[in-house]
Amino acid sequence: MDTLHHRFQQFQKTIWFNIFCYLWTGIFSFLAFAPVSLTHFVWIAPFGFFWLSLKYHGKYKKLFFHGLLIGVVFYAISFHWIIHMAITFGNFPYVVAILILLFAGLLFGLKFPIFMMSFSFLSGKIGRHSVWVAGFCGLLSELIGPQLFPWYWGNLAAGNIILAQNAEITGVYGISFLVFIVSYTLFQSNPWHWKEIIHSKEKRKQYLRFITLPALLLLTFIVSGIFLFKKWENVKPVKSLNVLIVQPDAPLSFRDGREIKESIEALMARIEKLTDEGAVRLGKKPDLIVLPEAGVPFFSAHKTEITTKVRRMYWDRFDSLMFLLANRYKANVFFNEIDAGFKGAPSPRNLRYYNNNVLYDPNGDRRDSYQKKFLLMFGEYMPFDFLYELSQQTGRFEPGLTHNLIRYYTPRYYTLAEKEKSPKGRHLGWTDTETFNHEAVRSYYETTRTEVSETGKFLPLICYEVILPEFVREFRTAGNPEFIVNLTNDKWYGATTESDQHMELGRLRSIELRRWMVRSTNSGISANIDHLGRFVGNKKTGLMTAEALSETIDVIDSPPTFYTQYGNLIPWLMLFLTGIYYLNLLIGIRRGKSS
């Protein structure tokens, strides 16, 4: 053991040790993250930080440099899909796509050097409470580090369903704090010290004192997680809804050699077929049919002066198909479209586009809509106009103005015959919309109109918004939703790990709000997630597939959770109080030296 220890110490002096640290943190973080989800590796993944912080203790420029390199390696391993996205979405050459990945690692991996420099500074100046210092610095780096695709160490640990329950109180940041506390404890419990701990009574006492706080903190999170899990597992739903998710695998563009009309016709027929097949598997009529973001790309079902004359985006056959699905099953249909409007006086300069979700009620009438508020930089807009010349596929979208919930409806039937009624003996289908214009389609179903009543409200999120916990909290001003619906298009990333990571990062919203989530994606991965963060029926769709997923979801009636009301209050309070304590210690140390 001593010989091995000596060799490791010699190895630490080499540049290869630095590379070893980069790879250690990068690889074990990836293994702990989705889709591999070997969560236990999260506890040792930060060791690379600790080794380099010890090697370059007090050398802040070097710590900053090595922290950046860890960020680049982490991004290259875990977020390698950025290359695919840059090529597919931005139409960039492969070399430029690699440079974009490296730039993302440097810029959005800043939380790594922030941790290493602050940890080296505080552990050196204070000289004690090193475990708490690790947690404090980890929390600090998580809270202030800039990110484009927000992920946190707590997300990696939340693969453990018990620990994940604490997100209801502490948010993901609280779990990140635990990760650094436990990780540093394990780091200091390395085999090199076992011999002296075993043979020295004093060393055993020191070690027991050292691990007491981390052990109590971990135990607190485990006990709290078990309590919350049991509490919410026993909550009875107030009602259930039959939900049908349609995953159409719509193309990103119509450039496969076929005529555009042929491609879009095939897509719309596929949507109709998947809906019918999903309803058959469900065995009953769905209450809610959900289509994903860009399920029907480039078109709008909103007939306005702007979408019909200024920019011809409205397609009556798109509008008709959504209307037909609503009437065929007397169900709510929630789908995505492109909408447009003027910002200010009507003029070409003031024309704006919106990423819009809208609901059609069981009569096919257009109801509430939600325009995406949190737009993705480089995807839906560019921070500077000249950048549009570099990536002409990037949209010019405008953020929505409101955080609003979506109302959904239940038809009122008076007889069984009325419930099963179809006009003139048959329902219209997609092919009929070629000969029936939208007004004719509506007229055909006029005799089947029924009274509908508002049943409840759900929280609508579009794509990226679901991974932003602070943003999702802002919907609390609109009321208390019954469940969450997330419409997403991850096709830009191909068959990479991004879809699994996107799903995993969004899963915690169900726990934070204690609401079931319906996640409908264009090309995968679609799923229903319960209020405990579990996949309902253990069902998920595949990647790059066209399929439907039918499931019954529960509605939990409960007041807003602690996290919904107070957000990251506990992590920020912990950071503030610890910061004040450390500042007081540093001032005392400085005064002691000057005297």
Curated annotation (Swiss-Prot):
The chain crosses the membrane at residues 30-50, 63-83, 95-115, 167-187, 210-230, 569-589. InterPro entries: Apolipo_AcylTrfase, C-N_Hydrolase, C-N_Hydrolase_sf, LNT_N. PANTHER family: APOLIPOPROTEIN N-ACYLTRANSFERASE (PTHR38686:SF1). Its EC number is 2.3.1.269. This is Apolipoprotein N-acyltransferase 2. It is found in: Cell inner membrane. Pathway: Protein modification; lipoprotein biosynthesis (N-acyl transfer). It is an enzyme of class 2 (transferase). Keywords: Acyltransferase, Cell inner membrane, Cell membrane, Membrane, Transferase, Transmembrane, Transmembrane helix. GO terms for biological process: lipoprotein biosynthetic process. Catalyzes the phospholipid dependent N-acylation of the N-terminal cysteine of apolipoprotein, the last step in lipoprotein maturation. Residues 241-555 form the CN hydrolase domain. Its main location: membrane. Belongs to the CN hydrolase family. Apolipoprotein N-acyltransferase subfamily. It comes from Leptospira interrogans serogroup Icterohaemorrhagiae serovar copenhageni (strain Fiocruz L1-130). It holds the Pfam family LNT_N. The active site is at 293 (proton acceptor), 372, 463 (nucleophile). One of its GO terms (cellular component) is plasma membrane. It is a multi-pass membrane protein. The gene is lnt2. GO terms for molecular function: N-acyltransferase activity.
